[in-house]
Amino acid sequence: MGNFFENTVAWMERKGLASKYRHAGIYCIKIDTDIVYIGKSANMLRRIAEHYVGIKTGSEKKYRILAEARRRGHPITFDVLYYAKSKGIANQLAEIGEKEGEYIRHYMPILNTQIPKAEDWNKYESKSVDE
């Protein structure tokens, strides 16, 4: 996966996506215009590259679902929902952890299997991804 992953990061950089995604924040994956997954990362560029690799390799159920949607002609896109405002990695991770929970509880994306609790984003309820 390492080589394919690094090639994917380089491809995203060539496409001019580094300035948008090389930050800590909250991102989403969409099928058509519907948000189907929300995640957080200290470096969204690298995390989104991991998702591209997952879709290509079908390494998890959510990626197989996304690959099938793409195969059927539905566009799969990524977008930024929130950029971390805090300074320092520990503060950024706490900030985006809390914000991610807010976004997941608001949108209830079908591919998120962990729903962070409002009172403590480190605790969550689990659900399965139905086929």
Region spans (language model):
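GIY-YIG nuclease catalytic motif and its immediate N-terminal context
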Residues: 1-46, 91, 122-131
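Generic signature of intrinsically disordered, low-complexity, basic-rich segments
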Residues: 4-6, 63-65, 114
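Conserved short loop/helix modules at catalytic or binding sites
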Residues: 44-90
